[in-house]
Amino acid sequence: MSKKVGFLQGNEAAAHGALYAGCKFFAGYPITPSTEVSEVLSIELPKVGGKFIQMEDEIGAMAALLGGALAGQKALTSTSGPGLSLKQELIGYGCIAEIPCVVYNVMRGGPSTGMPTGPSQSDVMCARW
């Protein structure tokens, strides 16, 4: 019996997990180290009838995410530390309005550009509260 084994990065696995969970809408802005989520979903979402939008910035991505969710879609965006900071006002709006959506935050090491290509746990308190 032969088994097919594949290897994925964590971001690629998260993108495929979102698809399996029924995600049909992604709005994002490419930012390291979360870019692979956008790369995978830009290819795979159209295959399942979903919509992929690359926005002009992180604020626009969060606004589009909330719009997609309000339109009834399972919606996702991905970001990293500085992008999460830019999204705060609209994250607050989404929380107070109880708009169901997913913000996938791939944390960077350091403040914002200390180690921009690697993951860390620097945004835990921001993501938690």
Regions found by a protein language model. Name each.
Residues 1-127:
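Thiamine diphosphate
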